[in-house]
A protein has these predicted regions:
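PLP-dependent amino-acid enzyme catalytic core
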Residues: 1-303
Length: 303
């Protein structure tokens, strides 16, 4: 498997502001299907699974989950069987209508659909015991992929070439990626996380995995109403940004985060000559699924 792990930093020139420097770390280019933070989160988990003799990976996710797609692709690439426990039993007959689930299935993942009520019990020991009875031995990956080994992988996102940046900006889902960045950032750097969903619970989740509470904060103003929710302003921004920079953005995570960073620059949040590193966490597979939903609503599509 070929991975692109070098020379990922791409400077971006802003048409409206020459006093703040933006560089995007193109983690989306690491691999066509196992890209961005998903590669980072899976790396050491795969090593552990292999060392412990597991042949099967089991994980959880929703209908358009980047983690489900990446885990399926990982299994295909590395010879693991994969099982995806999918939220929403109504999706059982709609696999081919859903680009993410169709990709996962074609990549060899066995999909088990459960009700949303049962999905809430996914971390309960009785439920995991039932899964072990059904599927025998498996290596468990949590929803979103965040655990201690995932944090270890995300700590490798920043390299020695990144120490000259003042701010590091990243989208936040389960909190694993930002935790890795917080742990590896230099003392003079500030990490800004942009949650893709509503709720202040993420702060405590992130604290579980971090060594410092001083060098980071969450910007909760750019979730666009919650997880998976977008509007025409965000679509316009994503499409315009791609035209101007040739960098595609996903609408769930990186698109929202970059919209927020640009808005903050316009409102003078950052001082002159500030150097900002933006982490592109991939997730581009989700564009196709989002466009299906946008088309149903008669809204503009993401290019």
């Amino acid at each position: 498997m070929e991975l692109m792990l070098q020379n990922l930093n791409q400077p971006v020139k802003l048409s409206f502001n020459n006093e703040v420097e933006i560089t995007i770390k193109r983690e989306d280019k690491i691999h066509p299907y196992i890209s961005g933070n998903k590669f980072r989160k899976l790396k050491y988990n795969l090593i552990a699974a292999k060392e412990q003799g597991y042949a099967t990976l089991l994980t959880f996710g929703g209908a358009f989950s980047n983690h489900i797609a990446a885990t399926a692709a990982t299994g295909y690439e590395f010879g693991f069987k994969t099982i995806g426990i999918i939220r929403g039993d109504e999706l059982d007959q709609k696999i081919n209508e859903n680009p993410t689930l169709a990709f996962a299935s074609k990549s060899g993942m066995h999909l088990k659909f459960i009700s949303r009520a049962l999905y809430k019990q996914k971390n309960e020991s009785y439920f995991l015991d039932e899964l072990k009875q059904e599927f025998d031995n498996f290596y468990l990956l949590p929803e979103g992929g965040t655990n201690e080994l995932a944090i270890k992988g995300c700590e490798e996102i920043l390299t020695k070439d990144d120490q000259f940046f003042d701010y590091i900006c990243v989208s936040v889902g389960t909190g694993g990626t930002i935790a890795g960045l917080i742990n590896s950032a230099k003392d003079h750097q500030k990490v800004l996380g942009f949650p893709a969903l509503k709720g202040n619970f993420l702060f405590d989740e992130i604290k579980k995995y971090t060594k410092s509470n001083k060098n980071w904060s969450l910007i909760n103003d750019y979730h666009f109403g919650g997880y998976g929710k977008i509007n025409s302003d965000l679509i316009t921004f994503i499409n315009k940004f791609k035209i101007e920079t040739e960098i595609p953005l996903d609408p769930i995570y990186t698109g929202k985060m970059l919209y927020g960073v640009i808005d903050m620059i316009k409102n003078d949040y950052f001082n002159r000559n500030t150097k900002i590193l933006i982490i592109h966490t991939g997730g581009l597979q989700g564009i196709q699924g989002m466009n299906v939903k946008l088309q149903q609503k008669g809204l503009p599509l993401i290019n």
